[in-house]
């Protein structure tokens, strides 16, 4: 039963990362000044 909990936790983390990546892409498209430095790094990360 403990293994099942880890699987669920892993899925939740992956979903959160995907949502975060989507938010990042939207922010980068908007060219928000705060995100400009992070966006430069973000381009090297293959989402």
Curated annotation (Swiss-Prot):
Keyword RNA-binding annotated: no
Keyword annotations of the record: Cell inner membrane, Cell membrane, Membrane, Repressor, Transcription, Transcription regulation, Transmembrane, Transmembrane helix
Subcellular locations according to the entry: Cell inner membrane
Topology class, membrane: Single-pass membrane protein
Main localisation: membrane
Spans within the Periplasmic topological domain: 27-47
Pfam families for the chain: MgrB (PF13998)
Segments traversing the membrane: 6-26
A Gene Ontology cellular-component term: plasma membrane
Subunit structure: May form homooligomers. Probably interacts with the periplasmic domain of PhoQ.
Protein family (similarity comment): Belongs to the MgrB family.
Purpose: PhoP-regulated transcription is redox-sensitive, being activated when the periplasm becomes more reducing. MgrB acts between DsbA/DsbB and PhoP/PhoQ in this pathway. Represses PhoP/PhoQ signaling, possibly by binding to the periplasmic domain of PhoQ, altering its activity and that of downstream effector PhoP.
Name recorded for this polypeptide: PhoP/PhoQ regulator MgrB
Protein species of origin: Salmonella typhimurium (strain 14028s / SGSC 2262)
Gene name in the database record: yobG
